[in-house]
Amino acid sequence: MQLIHFIVGLAMLISLSLAASDDRVLGWNKAHGLWGKRSVQEASQDKRTPQNWNKLNSLWGKRSASSFDDDYTTENGDDDVTMLYKRSNLSPRFLGRMTFARIPKISPAQWQRANGLWGR
């Protein structure tokens, strides 16, 4: 009787160890499929050009050399003041107390970056 229990126990132990190794192999294949094969495919995959990054352009602001030109100056400073009033979240009462001398010059490139990142 003890011999039968020993054989059954040994058979169960062997079957459990084989099942565990199959799970490990299956897990390795899943991991390889997620990381290894995908990485190889991406190397040969056609990428979008920066001009076709529509979703990124709407989220982060359009990326171009001119959008990062911080040396932008304008002859008419009223455009910058109007832009500041239009885009600010300050109350009209507070804005009424502000003088034009305190308003900093803000280039469109800075506004474009801020609009792309935080909306509005």
From Swiss-Prot:
GO terms for biological process: chemotaxis; neuropeptide signaling pathway. This is Neuropeptide-like protein 38. Expressed in the ventral and dorsal nerve cords and ventral nerve cord motor neurons. Also expressed in tail neurons and head neurons including SAB and DBI motor neurons. It comes from the Eukaryota. Coiled coil: none annotated. Its main location: secreted. Plays a role in several types of aversive gustatory associative learning including gustatory plasticity and salt avoidance learning. Residues 1-19 form the signal peptide. One of its GO terms (cellular component) is extracellular region. Keywords: Amidation, Behavior, Chemotaxis, Cleavage on pair of basic residues, Neuropeptide, Secreted, Signal. It comes from Caenorhabditis elegans. It is found in: Secreted.
